[in-house]
């Protein structure tokens, strides 16, 4: 067994992996028969057979190994954690998984780092970490089943309610949660049938972000045990990329345009105060920090204001801002005095927001933008058209940008009482005269060389869905 040098390089166990592939069943039978006791035990029959619980565990270890051999899985070793009746446990994984993990560890099939607990809410607390050992990795390397042979359990919960400590909260369904779940299921179905990729990537990865269909499933998460807090949509890999990489995404082999709400949370707070924003709220006329370029200064002001909207106090906001920058970034060493100067310049332009900062407003405002996204998703899902949401912006293929902007205006008016301002760097083909000469130049310019890896992934997608992807062509 190897040592786990960095137990923080991990993700939580995914208890919704499943596969009926015969080789998967054979591998799990080999492990069970060789290292685990008979599943003929006394007591009530489990909702999910113990061998099936082993299969879920082995599949998640296999997926983690494929993504990164050093990646660990965080798993609770407390019997109280495993609730077979939970709505977040569709396969009814039970506390039996704990002795299964112990048996695999004893057999040398796992690398394991025990969890640590120093007291309630201590930052260093963590669950036990596991990953496939060299022995199990060797077995994984010999199998012929592939990532595509591993799916997800039917009935996996998409509407998540968390408490203040990010723990999962059980709830009873209402007409609202049933509607939200069905709409999100339809949205995920539209996304699953679309080919969403980046043509310049030969290998489907940007830094630590996997660009593939296995990281496209979206969930909706509410916070603080309150359906009025958060409610944003999370999950698509595009949410983890910066705007430059997002601009290179193609949907169904067609370039995209990203449309964003300008200063969304500032706009929402201004609307609530009865004030109409004039121009860019983050731009100030003078350079406030010596040696800092104007564009970087704007970026710092924007990050400071958004942090101040989310924070409960000025001290926590300033600390959080600095902590969010990497070593060497200009923002890392900003003093409180400099931050006060930036904040004062912002408030000089938007004095109506002074009483709205440092009041923990962000989580409430997220609920409003989540409702807006719900309207946007619904409109395009009804047409079978994929649209990618990034909380305050949306990406769509460049033939539907004007339509997207109209839907965003409609949605924000329904939710907030007024159409919020939007902006987009690139224009949509439905916003211009398609016969204009510059439009052909634009279409040509947006066409990106396709890498060999991209073309292979496109062909695999077409085989999987049983039809050809038809990109837009200007006639």
Predicted regions: what is each one?
Residues 355-372:
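Adenine-nucleotide phosphate-binding core of ATP-dependent small-molecule kinases
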Residues 312-317, 401-475:
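C-terminal polymerase-core module
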Residues 2-73, 363-364:
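Short alpha-helical segments that sit at the start of domains
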Residues 37-44, 48-52, 63, 73-94, ...:
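Helical catalytic core of nucleic-acid polymerases
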Residues 260-261, 386-398:
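Catalytic palm active-site di-aspartate
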Residues 124-297, 393:
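Acidic, glycine-rich two-metal-ion catalytic cores of nucleic acid-processing enzymes
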Residues 101-119, 384-388:
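A short, conserved structural fragment
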Residues 371-390:
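Active-site palm subdomain of RNA-directed nucleic acid polymerases
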């Amino acid at each position: 067994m190897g040592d786990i040098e960095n137990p923080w390089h991990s993700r939580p166990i995914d208890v919704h992996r499943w596969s009926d592939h015969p080789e998967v069943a054979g591998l799990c039978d080999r492990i069970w028969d060789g290292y685990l006791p008979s599943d003929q035990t006394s007591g009530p029959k489990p909702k999910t057979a113990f061998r099936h619980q082993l299969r879920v565990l082995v599949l998640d270890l296999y997926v983690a190994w494929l993504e990164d051999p050093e990646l660990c899985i965080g798993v609770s070793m407390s019997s109280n954690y495993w609730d077979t009746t939970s709505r977040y446990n569709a396969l009814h994984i039970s506390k039996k998984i704990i002795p299964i993990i112990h048996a695999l560890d004893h057999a040398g099939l796992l690398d394991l780092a025990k969890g640590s607990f120093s007291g309630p809410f201590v930052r260093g607390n963590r669950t036990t970490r596991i990953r496939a050992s060299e022995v199990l990795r060797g077995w994984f390397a010999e199998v012929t089943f592939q990532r595509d042979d591993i799916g997800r359990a039917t009935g996996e919960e998409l509407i998540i309610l968390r408490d203040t400590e990010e723990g999962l909260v059980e709830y009873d369904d209402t007409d609202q949660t049933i509607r939200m779940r069905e709409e999100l299921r339809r949205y995920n179905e539209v996304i699953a049938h679309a080919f969403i990729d980046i043509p310049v990537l030969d290998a489907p990865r940007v830094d630590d972000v996997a660009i593939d269909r296995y990281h496209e499933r979206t969930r909706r998460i509410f916070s603080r045990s309150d359906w009025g807090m958060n409610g944003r949509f999370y999950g698509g890999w595009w949410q983890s990329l910066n705007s430059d990489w997002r601009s290179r995404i193609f949907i169904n082999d067609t370039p995209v345009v990203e449309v964003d709400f300008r200063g969304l949370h500032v706009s929402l707070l201004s609307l609530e105060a009865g004030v109409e924003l004039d121009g860019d709220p983050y731009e100030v006329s003078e350079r406030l920090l010596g040696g800092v370029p104007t564009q970087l200064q704007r970026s710092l002001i924007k990050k400071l204001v958004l942090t101040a909207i989310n924070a409960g106090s000025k001290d926590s906001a300033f600390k959080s801002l600095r902590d969010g920058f990497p070593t060497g970034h200009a923002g890392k060493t900003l003093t409180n005095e400099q931050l006060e100067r930036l904040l004062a310049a912002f408030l000089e332009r938007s004095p109506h927001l002074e009483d709205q900062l440092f009041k923990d407003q962000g989580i409430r405002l997220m609920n409003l933008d989540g409702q807006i996204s719900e309207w946007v998703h619904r409109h395009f899902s009804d047409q079978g058209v994929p649209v990618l949401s990034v909380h305050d912006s949306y990406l769509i293929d460049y033939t539907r940008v004007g339509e997207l902007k109209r839907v965003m205006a409609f949605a924000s008016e329904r939710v907030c009482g007024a159409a919020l301002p939007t902006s987009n760097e690139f224009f949509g083909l439905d916003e211009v005269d398609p016969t204009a000469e510059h439009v052909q130049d634009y279409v040509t310019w947006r066409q990106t060389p396709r890498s060999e890896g991209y073309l292979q992934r496109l062909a695999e997608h077409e085989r999987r869905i049983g039809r050809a992807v038809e990109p837009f062509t200007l006639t």
